[in-house]
UniProtKB/Swiss-Prot annotation:
Note: There are two types of cytoskeletal and microfibrillar keratin: I (acidic; 40-55 kDa) and II (neutral to basic; 56-70 kDa).
Protein's UniProt name: Keratin, type I cytoskeletal 20
Function: Plays a significant role in maintaining keratin filament organization in intestinal epithelia. When phosphorylated, plays a role in the secretion of mucin in the small intestine.
Residues where Phosphoserine is found: S13, S16, S26
Species this protein is from: Bos taurus
Residues covered by region (Head): 1-69
């Protein structure tokens, strides 16, 4: 028997009606010996009859049933009994053969519920551990990426702060340069003023000498007239005193200007030195932070590449197990479809078996009746019965199973039965 899966299954069965029994007392009777034949499984089972004409004559009321042709009747009944017994044995053998085939099919095709999957548990556990390790590694990578981002943000803030400080120092340097330029200009102005004052002093000395010479020349040509007057002023002494006074003031102003200039120059040099050192330290720190930033950027890039590789591996693992799961699901759907087919075939065979069992029961009843007749039970109450041939009605039953399969899975199943006469 073939239990392969099909979308449409047709099972044909034919039922037959055995000839009915009629009781009559006509002179000519037809002796009927029915026999049953059919294939394995009960397909195409029908009952055929063999007939012969016998002239029994008239049977008187209350006469013997086997009067006239008793030997032929007994032989006919024995033949029919042997035929029935042989048919019963044949049906029993066919039934046992069908049961063995069904049992064999269930043993070979039905998936075992107690199947040992322990061989796969180790591999499944190992794969689950790998998936968990990959997930943990992915989480670690994400955490490291977040930490790197936070560190990068901190370094960026520090870099911005140091750059602001550097810009402030540069601005201070520019301011100090401007102050230095102003002091240089002030120094030049003071030097110019000193030169001008020196020139004025020389000019005043020349004028004083000229005035003294002119006065001496004028006094030498005049008569010395003595008058009673207060003593005249000593212009030379006054000029010398004024010259000394102005020289002292010029020297004092020059000394003060030099001291102030030196003080400002020293302060400016100290500020420039400090600013230069700070600028150098800031440049070194900026260089170090730039190097750290490049290192962190490389680490971030490597972590991103590792993350992409892990995500790709995870996707491949999910796809591989998804395809494996889809294959298992398709196999499960196929087995479910085969199970539905087996159940349908089993129900059909049970139906056919019930038909054969009914035929067997009727045959056993007829055998029991014939046995009673042979044993002589109530012989006087029976008259010779004849089996008139009746029209055998054949029917064909078409069973159609329609299954809708989507992605290897049985979505719906519909069974249609159509019975038509042949």
């Amino acid at each position: 028997m073939d239990f392969s899966q099909r979308s449409f299954h047709r099972s044909l069965s034919s039922s037959s009606q055995s000839p009915g029994l009629s009781m009559s007392s006509s002179i000519y009777r037809r002796g009927v010996a029915p026999s049953v034949y059919g294939g394995a499984g009960g397909h195409g089972t029908r009952i055929s009859t063999s007939r012969h004409l016998a002239n029994y004559g008239s049977v008187p009321a209350g006469g013997n049933l086997f009067a006239g042709n008793e030997k032929m009747t007994m032989q006919n009944l024995n033949d029919r009994l042997a035929s029935y017994l042989e048919r019963v044995r044949s049906l029993e053998q066919s039934n046992s053969h069908l049961e063995q085939q069904i049992k064999h099919w269930y043993e070979t095709n039905t998936p075992s519920t107690g199947r040992d999957h322990s061989a796969y548990m180790g591999q499944i556990k190992e794969l689950r551990d790998q998936i968990k390790d990959a997930q943990l590694q992915n989480a670690r990578c994400v955490l490291q990426i977040d930490n790197a981002k936070l560190a990068m943000e901190d370094f960026r803030l520090k870099y911005e702060a140091e750059r602001g400080i550097c810009q402030t120092v540069v601005a201070d340097l520019h301011g100090l340069k401007r102050v230095f330029d102003e002091l240089t200009l002030t120094k030049a102005d003071l030097e110019i003023q000193i030169e001008e004052l020196t020139k004025d002093l020389h000019l005043l000395q020349k004028e004083h000498e000229e005035e003294v010479r002119s006065l001496r020349a004028h006094l030498g040509n005049n008569v010395n007239v003595e008058v009673d007057a207060p003593p005249s002023l000593n212009l030379g002494a006054i000029m010398n005193e004024m010259r000394q006074k102005y020289d002292a003031m010029a020297q004092e102003n020059l000394q003060k200007a030099k001291e102030q200039f030196e003080i400002q120059i020293n302060d400016l040099q100290q500020q420039v030195t400090v600013s230069t050192e700070e600028l150098k330290g800031t440049k070194d720190q900026i260089k170090e932070q730039r190097h750290t930033y490049q290192v962190l950027e490389l680490e971030l890039q490597s972590l991103l590449n590792m993350k992409e590789a892990l995500e790709h591996t995870l996707e491949e693992t999910n796809a591989r197990y998804g395809s494996h799961l889809a294959k298992i699901q398709a196999r499960l759907n196929s087995l479910e479809g085969q199970l539905v087919q087996v159940r349908t075939d089993t129900e059909r065979q049970i139906h056919e078996y019930n038909i054969l069992l009914d035929i067997k029961i009727r045959l056993e009843q007829e055998i029991a009746t014939y046995r009673r007749l042979l044993e002589g039970e109530d012989v006087k109450e029976y008259q010779l019965s004849t089996l008139d041939e009746k029209d055998i009605k054949k029917t064909r039953k078409i069973k159609t199973v329609v299954q809708e399969v989507v992605d290897g899975k049985v979505v719906s199943s519909e069974v249609k039965e159509v019975e038509e006469s042949v």
